[in-house]
From Swiss-Prot:
Protein's name according to its UniProt entry: Probable nitrate transporter NarT
Domain of life the protein comes from: Bacteria
Family of the protein in this entry: Belongs to the major facilitator superfamily. Nitrate/nitrite porter (TC 2.A.1.8) family.
Induction remarks: Positively regulated by the two-component system NreB/NreC.
UniProt xrefs under CDD domains: MFS_NRT2_like (cd17341)
Membrane topology category: Multi-pass membrane protein
UniProt subcellular location: Cell membrane
Keyword Thylakoid listed: no
Transmembrane segments: 14-34, 45-65, 69-89, 97-117, 139-159, 161-181, 211-231, 246-266, 268-288, 294-314, 331-351, 353-373
Primary role: Probably required for nitrate uptake under anoxic conditions. Also possibly involved in excretion of nitrite produced by the dissimilatory reduction of nitrate.
InterPro entries given in the database record: MFS (IPR011701), MFS_dom (IPR020846), MFS_trans_sf (IPR036259), NO3_transporter (IPR044772)
Biological process terms in GO annotation: nitrate assimilation
Organism encoding this protein: Staphylococcus aureus (strain JH9)
Lineage: Bacteria, Bacillati, Bacillota, Bacilli, Bacillales
An example Gene Ontology CC term for this record: plasma membrane
Amino acid sequence: MYKTKGGFQLTLQTLSLVVGFMAWSIIAPLMPFIKQDVNVTEGQISIILAIPVILGSVLRVPFGYLTNIVGAKWVFFTSFIVLLFPIFFLSQAQTPGMLMASGFFLGVGGAIFSVGVTSVPKYFPKEKVGLANGIYGMGNIGTAVSSFLAPPIAGIIGWQTTVRSYLIIIALFALIMFIFGDTQERKIKVPLMAQMKTLSKNYKLYYLSYWYFITFGAFVAFGIFLPNYLVNHFGIDKVDAGIRSGVFIALATFLRPIGGILGDKFNAVKVLMIDFVIMIIGAVILGISDHIALFTVGCLTISICAGIGNGLIFKLVPSYFSNEAGSANGIVSMMGGLGGFFPPLVITYVANLTGSSHLAFIFLAVFGCIALFTMRHLYQKEYGSLKHS
């Protein structure tokens, strides 16, 4: 019975995450269409694309905590109701300010990530948590759904009507969660400040947050900037750019459970070190690529490593912070979201300063190298020599 309930709630919450991420990411794939109707500069575009990440990151901490207090059902339901307003406002946007305001509150769709990673592990034994969280993380595919479907639909019915169609989906899932959400979910009522005090003293939280800042940050950042970047720098058609961006997102999403499985079967930190070495290579490839073929190889390498890395990290979070899982999940996932905020701005700034975005990708490789040192430190403190696992 409990196993059946766990499977059902995992499915329900994963689909809810799909819908949340569809809303969170709707602006990026439609930007090539939006900028034809709204007068925006390239600098404004980079800010508009990055803004949804702010609230989508910061709210992950209270959302994770509230999930332990009231349960996933009510956090999901309330989030969907709130999302109806910025989606409608976006469909009416006529100025950069309106785009920024609606994008900011669309961040609620990204914040719900911490709801499931806090709730789902309650339904599964410890040895299955990595896989369960990996499956839930596949809800990130919502970003790819918007990338794949929004541009061709917008080409037929217009971007405003495309955005308004999301109102139906969001309202439907609010109703589904209200009816089928689990009111009997186990609650964990540890005072927030007590959790924060405990977490602040644990260096593992800082390491995991930094690693997720890179892996999930890369996932979010590439999903945000790729559609517009491919159109501007390689002259790719708007719909084709959306599809290519969707492939990046889908690949990372489907590989996330693989990361969870690897974390369940092997030492997650050791596997993560291998993953980051390959990611660094991918970043270097992007840093030297001037042709679309080489750029594609670099992007796919980053996509694979980001997806597997995301799954590995969220295998480790509940293992290290069982009593403070909600807050720890929120903090780590918040840092991952913020990791997606800065790269589009940095890429635009570096491109304006140097005439090329190559240096920005090299920064990713440098951040990855620093992460490797922290992983080695954690591994040696937890398990001893790297020669033994």
